Amino acid sequence: MAKRGKRYQQLLSLIEKGRLYSPKEAVSLVKKLATAKFDETINLAVRLGVDPRHADQQVRGTVVLPYGTGKEKKVLVFAEGEKAQEAREAGADYVGGEDLVKQIESGWLDFDVAIATPDIMGTLKIPSRLGKILGPRGLMPNPKTGTVTNDIAKAVKEYKAGRVEFRTDRYGIVHVPIGKASFSEEALYKNLMTVLGTLLRLKPAAAKGQYFKSIYISPSMGPSVPIDTKNIADLVKQEEAA
């Protein structure tokens, strides 16, 4: 493992060894750890008590962060006629049908999210034509994440406002950006608790034992702050009831 630089070691010394922080303490500390010369993304990593090798224990979904991610997403929509007009009015960056499919087939991928109406998925044969291009990049429209939908306007607005997709990796870890270092502590905290609340609601029935195994937040260029998982479900429920 490569030796960390002096700056990283100095930041690491700000984290008490062996201590688990409350969500609010962790958010306060992670802002102090973001000392790079750019506005660092604050990332959340949650290890869940699931076995992702089993289909009934995979956790996948989307969440709309109340304060957004701090990054403007380029949204592409496969739609025609009235639905295409809805997409444009909602703020989609690229709207089209066969023209966009051909552009993507030729190597163009200058977008962050792809949304499609259910009918156009079939008429343009999007799964078979673009599956190998968009699938590995996590860009393939999918009903499970709300990117295959007839409510195009709502989907576009939500992704523009800060909707993010997530899924467990092969280790059972979910990675979600919860904002930028320039965000207020309140904004980062609200975004953090919103993600945890969403994960709690998506807990698979087949998952046994402790659900939140570990929770960490970190800036792009800094060390991770461990969050105490004890009573986290109660904290989430209190926050949602407030």
Swiss-Prot record:
Record's signal peptide: none
Protein name, per record: Large ribosomal subunit protein uL1
InterPro entries noted in UniProt: Ribosom_uL1_bac-type, Ribosomal_uL1, Ribosomal_uL1-like, Ribosomal_uL1/biogenesis, Ribosomal_uL1_3-a/b-sand
Top-level division of the source organism's lineage: Bacteria
This protein's encoding gene: rplA
HAMAP family assigned to the protein according to its UniProt record, in alphabetical order: Ribosomal_uL1_B
Complexes and interactors: Part of the 50S ribosomal subunit.
Organism: Dictyoglomus turgidum (strain DSM 6724 / Z-1310)
Family matches, as Gene3D superfamilies: 3.30.190.20, 3.40.50.790
PANTHER family: 54S RIBOSOMAL PROTEIN L1, MITOCHONDRIAL, LARGE RIBOSOMAL SUBUNIT PROTEIN UL1M
GO BP field: regulation of translation; translation
Disulfide feature: none
Family, as annotated: Belongs to the universal ribosomal protein uL1 family.
Keyword Ribosomal protein: yes
CC terms in the record's Gene Ontology section: large ribosomal subunit
Keyword Metal-binding: no
Lineage: Bacteria, Pseudomonadati, Dictyoglomota, Dictyoglomia, Dictyoglomales
NCBIfam families found in the cross-reference section: rplA_bact
GO molecular function: rRNA binding; structural constituent of ribosome; tRNA binding
Protein task: Binds directly to 23S rRNA. The L1 stalk is quite mobile in the ribosome, and is involved in E site tRNA release.
Alphabetic keyword roster: Repressor, Ribonucleoprotein, Ribosomal protein, RNA-binding, rRNA-binding, Translation regulation, tRNA-binding
Pfam families: Ribosomal_L1
